[in-house]
Swiss-Prot record:
Pathway: Protein modification; lipoprotein biosynthesis (signal peptide cleavage). PROSITE patterns: SPASE_II. HAMAP family: LspA. Its main location: membrane. It comes from Vibrio cholerae serotype O1 (strain ATCC 39541 / Classical Ogawa 395 / O395). This is Lipoprotein signal peptidase. GO terms for biological process: proteolysis. NCBIfam families: lspA. Disulfide bonds: none annotated.
Amino acid sequence: MSNSSLTLKQSGLRWLWLALLVFIADITIKLIVMDNMGYGWANRIEVLPFFNLLYVHNYGAAFSFLSDQEGWQRWLFTGIAFVVTGMLAYWMRRLPASDKWNNIAYALIIGGAVGNVFDRIVHGFVVDYLDFYWGTYHWPAFNLADSTICIGAAMIILDGFRAKKSAPSQS
């Protein structure tokens, strides 16, 4: 059976439930943060000696990339997220559902991307709340969606190394 003749049930689109779960968890956490935490550094909750909960607005991309710009980046990142989501969904449609590693990676990225797009469209910014630091250095605040995007991307990169190792050597 060729990949193009897979039924929806046989294809990787079966894994979109994971993207939906990530999206729902991300939006739920962000709503809880917005409704229950004061905005900004003064209202942080110190959890561990290297970790705070901190409600901030991110007008840029992951880890505040381009957040200091004048607003054009909101639509750029929204457009990129739509293109990437469409591309990954297309690849999931062509992959068998049994290719768990890649389908999980794609679903994590899709769920995170859609969560951040939702924020950009509804609020005009992305809600970030995780603040890790060492001494006086603080990693830019981020959220669950950013985390799942990074995990999915790391899985794709790792899969590239795995695929190279399992390929037969040519003489």
